[in-house]
Amino acid sequence: MYDASDPFYMVMQKYNMKRGNTMIKAGIIGATGYAGAELVRILMNHKEVEIAWYGSRSYVDENYADIYGNMFQIVDAKCMDDNMEELAESVDVIFTATPQGFLAGVLTEDILSKVKIVDLSADFRIKDVATYEKWYKIEHKSPQFIDEAVYGLCEINRDKVTKETRLVANPGCYTTCSILTAYPLVKEGLIDTDTLIVDAKSGTSGAGRGAKTPNLFCEVNESMKAYGVASHRHNPQIEEQLGYAAGKEILINFTPHLVPMNRGILATEYATLKKKPDGTLPTYDEIKAVYDKYYANEKFVRVLKKGVCPETKWVEGSNYVDVNFVIDERTGRIIMMGALDNLVKGAAGQAVQNMNLLFGFDEAEGLNMVPMFP
């Protein structure tokens, strides 16, 4: 909660009192996509937030509950357009759950001066414009805002997401899982990052709600395939963020796979362990101590017990990331594993986590969902 003596709090209170409430107002652009719908579900249980704008270019003036039947008699609102200028005048925070290029194409200093933005697209995740344009194959329309955008991986950049922050680049699903799984060992220099391989599996919701032949039931069911091999757009994000941790440029092999389930990501990562001065490999207890150093006090990262491998089912519908590792003494390599729900911690949940930091709320507010099982 806010500190009542905080000037920021007092300004917000005066602002909200003019509108007859003490809750902040949120607008969602892309509210009818899977990540946008998950934002709606989470924010409806957030005691500090009122959703004031269900933005959807495809469904303007249609009842939101007619699009998502699970919201029948829960959401009584019509979809609105994606007019960012009008929205910035009406709310305190905007979530843009939109395709790449949307926010960069409409963002102005005037908009940013009026409202905080949590962007779930990749427009401001990569600091190098040329790298963004190479991997996404579009021109970046607002490079002037890249430097100030904070990469909102909360467990790593929490101190940078503050009340003064205007723009948060919410990390992607594969990137969140891949980075958090390896981050402690990269940061502490315990693995040879030149040998790092990331093998990841995702459910079909990661491809979005749009109808595409490769994502039809008969195409996906009872099948599994690699895609974006050596070319997936999350590759440079993982390299950039782990490169910051390592203090040097990192190149990785990242291969995503599509599996026949609705939600979830499982990342299995491999790297050669660096030997200790005495020529031996780090022990299980030594590696476990490193993970505990970074994650023991983290609400949403769970380091599992020895011998327990993460499963997507154990995090489904929640904001948790489960991680663990196994040392292969025969090869001198370590196998790191991580699992999360791609729509929650991999998208909407992390976006709300960032919003909580932006407004000084309890970081876990609205996010204490118990994973669904079975």
Model-derived features with residue positions:
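N-terminal Rossmann-like NAD(P) cofactor-binding subdomain of oxidoreductases
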Residues: 2-222, 227-229, 326-329, 370-374
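NAD(P)-dependent Rossmann-like dehydrogenase/reductase catalytic/cofactor-binding core
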Residues: 320-374
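Short strand->helix junction
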Residues: 175, 276-277, 341
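Short, well-ordered loop/turn and helix-capping segments at boundaries between secondary-structure elements
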Residues: 45, 244, 357-361
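C-terminal substrate-binding/catalytic lobe of Rossmann-fold NAD(P)-dependent oxidoreductases
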Residues: 48-90, 194-200, 204-336
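Conserved active-site and cofactor/substrate-binding residues in soluble primary-metabolism enzymes
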Residues: 34, 148, 176-180, 229-237, ...
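Predominant activation on well-ordered alpha-helical scaffold segments within soluble catalytic domains
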Residues: 40, 179-186, 235-239, 288, ...
